[in-house]
């Protein structure tokens, strides 16, 4: 035995000795707890809570708290956790993974650490892989928690936000992994604090933890909305509008390739889109469409910045090589604006509003633990990614299952013939059989062959969780034959029917090896629960996917030497099993490397997401004036604009700064180049900033009180942040696709992604601050539109345009016949005619 292996075994033994010592201390309270009346036992919960508030740690409370749960489970459920279950509970409380075999009572084991951690009052999430298991476990184990005075909630996808909020406020919340993730993302998209449903993430206990944190690690949770045809129409409308403009209607800053509408252009936009003010807060999305249409038409040049392919696709031209960049798209909606400009089909895309992987979702919990019967093979990944140890827990009774040596056949046909013959023989003697397959297609194929052989059976393809649990529960009855994909029915025990033990227990037949040893072990673990007899047998063929991809030359050469005329010949040897296991290890290594790379990429977004979400949450929960934050954004925007021209010709620089000031800060006629000539950059910055502060104060003076000001500030920031963040996610996704090709140029794609992703994030922050500045300076604020602004903060751009109010009915007593657009409205509202009754006229 190698020194490393010996050390691992010794470490496991040492850990088990520590756990056993704690378990014995828990057991020492058994007689005392049994002597308590129901009332006195239930009174332990408020006592523990008070002791925790007084400074005792959960570790100090553990022995007594675990003992209370054991006794409560005995009285309520008629179940009494064994010592090994106590040991498993301690491992869970420590934030690790106890590897407990199938049938060893993981669900009951979880009650002890869940109860203990719920005493802190910060919420415990019990995570399952489907809603059936969440509902089942919450109903069954919830009886114990409720009896002990703790509240239990079930978070289901169909529940309303109010119902979800109530579930999350419970001491213990049962939910699926996906629903917890989606709720987290949705909470970071709301505008009001009262619309959030989750509390801060405290302790998660994940059932079937390997399935959630390993198998699904590469699958991101994505909240997205398809870009509707209405939105595509807005690209076209914006394009049609900018094509009507004259050169005086927009101002181009050539060095920075930026463009904006002049005052005359703004007037035309308001008339074209029938708006009172283009820069009102609810029109943030529309200004984005117009800005992109301006860039597409007057800055982006055909055959220089892009080309149109024969298929009508817009292809970006690499400015360094002159080659087209297949698969890349301009971000921020610019690509769609160019498609509208060139009259080609606007590609409908789903817009990702938020996304997160399970890896990063569950790493946000203060403490994370999980249960499974098969995790040791993924020990390195659990340790490196989640900082969780795998602690194998002894079974309560010795395992009596017989695991037969694998059987290898030359062809799929000969293998399936052997499987059907084995199933038939066992069916005829009454022994229940569970046939495990890797794919649904294999399940259907075997089912067809069993029908031909006259063998009644059930087929389970993991499509209906409620039905599958019932089928799996009956799979241990005499004469039962069940076909299931490997993951189907996971989490439900197979109990043996009457007389089945004498027949050898449940026989599990694997029709091929999965690429993961862990999945094979899960299938085997269906049989032989809690010391029951059982058997497992795997059938393989050289035509299996795993063998074709990773089968060794030794196996193939051995079969070549055999009589090829007899395809039913079978190989049965330990050497074969070792070779297959070696192939599985290679696949597992490849998969781990892939997941690790996914995590490296996602960590870039994680860091950025945490910054955006933290700032967003700060805005939502703020009960203070957000003026200092907005003023800081205005200051940085002005500084960036002035610095961008510091190295250009002074006259050109002054002209460009004046252009920026007119389009983004002050009324066009109130500033000119003459006013800024002779000033240094710092003096120009101060002058523009002081002018901006005057406009800022004037804007806020239009709102009636501090509550109205705070609401306006919040909606202003949140709308712009959400728009820019959504666009940034798309841009990062495109960047990730692009950098993958750079590996061929000896560049590390991950490093390239990190570097460019950081620069893009900085650019996004600048864009957010610019839009906040421009909207704050240019918006026409009306107190009566405050509630409307909040409503618009959660709608799409298309809905924004459609929802515009057209204006009040005409006052028949007023004379509108000779009123020009920019004249004061005759109704004496104080507004320009175009912004009042003229809206309907035009």
Swiss-Prot record:
The keyword Transport applies. Gene3D superfamilies: Helical scaffold and wing domains of SecA, P-loop containing nucleotide triphosphate hydrolases, SecA, preprotein cross-linking domain. Its EC number is 7.4.2.8. SUPFAM superfamilies: Helical scaffold and wing domains of SecA, P-loop containing nucleoside triphosphate hydrolases, Pre-protein crosslinking domain of SecA. It catalyses: ATP + H2O + cellular proteinSide 1 = ADP + phosphate + cellular proteinSide 2. Its main location: membrane. It is an enzyme of class 7 (translocase). The keyword Endoplasmic reticulum does not apply. GO terms for cellular component: cell envelope Sec protein transport complex; cytosol; plasma membrane. Zn(2+) binds at residues 825, 827, 836-837. InterPro entries: Helicase_ATP-bd, Helicase_C-like, P-loop_NTPase, SEC_C_motif, SecA, SecA_CS, SecA_DEAD, SecA_motor_DEAD. GO terms for molecular function: ATP binding; metal ion binding; protein-exporting ATPase activity. Its cofactor is Zn(2+). It is a peripheral membrane protein. May bind 1 zinc ion per subunit. It comes from the Bacteria. Keywords: ATP-binding, Cell membrane, Cytoplasm, Membrane, Metal-binding, Nucleotide-binding, Protein transport, Translocase, Translocation, Transport, Zinc. ATP binds at residues 85, 103-107, 493. GO terms for biological process: intracellular protein transmembrane transport; protein import; protein targeting; protein transport by the Sec complex. PROSITE patterns: SECA, SECA_MOTOR_DEAD. Belongs to the SecA family. Part of the Sec protein translocase complex. Interacts with the SecYEG preprotein conducting channel. Has a central role in coupling the hydrolysis of ATP to the transfer of proteins into and across the cell membrane, serving as an ATP-driven molecular motor driving the stepwise translocation of polypeptide chains across the membrane. PANTHER family: CHLOROPLAST PROTEIN-TRANSPORTING ATPASE, SECA INNER MEMBRANE COMPONENT OF SEC PROTEIN SECRETION SYSTEM. Monomer and homodimer. Part of the essential Sec protein translocation apparatus which comprises SecA, SecYEG and auxiliary proteins SecDF. Other proteins may also be involved. This is Protein translocase subunit SecA.
